Amino acid sequence: MNRTLQPDRGASQTAPAAHQARAFAPASVANVAVGFDLLGYPMDQVGDTVTVRRIDTPQVRIAAIRGIAQPLPLQTERNTAGAALLSMHRDLALPFGFELEIDKGIPLSSGMGGSAASCVAALLAANALLEEPLRREHLYRYALDGEAVASGSRHGDNLGPLFLGGLVLCTLERLVPVTVPAAWHSLLVHPDTLLETRRAREVLKDPYLLPDIVTQSANLALVLAGCYHGDAELVRAGLRDVLIEPRRAPLIAGFTAAQQAALQADAMGASISGAGPSVFAWFQTRSAAEAAAPAVRAAFTAAGFDSQAWVTPLISPGARLL
């Protein structure tokens, strides 16, 4: 499966096909235990949809935000989708503007990449309205500016998977697709509670010990090697977080029990999705992931939270025009 960055359809057009476009971007799992701010993949069963209209006034404005994540700022500079389009608009010095409407399907502060989804969907839709649409790696730079509004830092682990699909290694300069066996699936469980990204980052400020950093680096190497070779035992040996999870786990009621439930169901590994509170786990088959879901959800029920669960292949599609 070729997941290298490609120009969008219509990139050679000399005039926009329409004055309105819509795009969908799915939820995503970021960090993946061993790749803090570096590694992520999409979960395409839930996501955000953004409609962008081309307007004569050279400005970016948000007309409406609807859906399950409320309230979110309508001020362009304070909204990830708006900030990303502002970055594009200023960089290209466009003589026209954009008006956008955001339909949120991803819960707020869920660790499911909601800010990234709105951001990428907005960029894809706006890009379709340009006389000469840009390649997706160019859009990635604008998306990084948008994501910084939500978390206070530029990081691409939620963004890259939405541009490429599948498991992606994301630096600030490039996106690298990671080969994964088609049979491997991810379980994602979201408890009905909030954990703000900025708060989750605050607990990471204290220094880390060098031996822990070395261990985490080795774990990342094991996971990447296991993915490329299709070796579940390598992944099982490496898919554990010794840096971020120990500091964030106390912020998530029920996390430890949920993680143990997944591991007892033969998960290759389980940890916090993004900043949390959602939890992900990797399995070698869809049936194993589906069988584990009730026990993981039960752990959050015992902690006092309702929850939702989704199962998707690790090789899932990213954002797309509608």
Curated annotation (Swiss-Prot):
SUPFAM superfamilies on file: GHMP Kinase, C-terminal domain, Ribosomal protein S5 domain 2-like
Q: Give the EC number(s) under which this enzyme is classified.
A: 2.7.1.39
Q: Give the enzyme class.
A: transferase
- Name of protein: Homoserine kinase
The cross-references to InterPro entries, in alphabetical order and at most eight, read: GHMP_kinase_C_dom, GHMP_kinase_C_sf, GHMP_kinase_N_dom, Homoserine_kinase, Ribosomal_Su5_D2-typ_SF, Ribsml_uS5_D2-typ_fold_subgr
NCBIfam families referenced in this protein's UniProt entry, alphabetically: PRK01212.1-4, thrB
The UniProt entry's sequence similarity note says: Belongs to the GHMP kinase family. Homoserine kinase subfamily.
Question: Which Gene3D superfamilies does this UniProt record tie to the protein?
Answer: 3.30.230.10, GHMP kinase, C-terminal domain
What does the protein in this record do?
Answer: Catalyzes the ATP-dependent phosphorylation of L-homoserine to L-homoserine phosphate.
Extract the GO molecular function terms from the UniProt entry: ATP binding; homoserine kinase activity
Q: Which domain of life is it from?
A: Bacteria
Query: Which keywords appear in this protein's UniProt record, sorted alphabetically?
Result: Amino-acid biosynthesis, ATP-binding, Cytoplasm, Kinase, Nucleotide-binding, Threonine biosynthesis, Transferase
Where is this gene product found? Cytoplasm
- A matching Pfam family: GHMP_kinases_N
The record's Gene Ontology biological-process terms are: threonine biosynthetic process
Q: Which residues bind ATP per the record?
A: P107, L108, S109, S110, G111, M112, G113, G114, S115, A116, A117
Q: In which pathway does it act?
A: Amino-acid biosynthesis; L-threonine biosynthesis; L-threonine from L-aspartate: step 4/5
From the UniProt record, list the reaction(s) this protein catalyses. Answer: L-homoserine + ATP = O-phospho-L-homoserine + ADP + H(+)
Q: Extract the PANTHER family matched here.
A: HOMOSERINE KINASE, HOMOSERINE/4-DIPHOSPHOCYTIDYL-2-C-METHYL-D-ERYTHRITOL KINASE
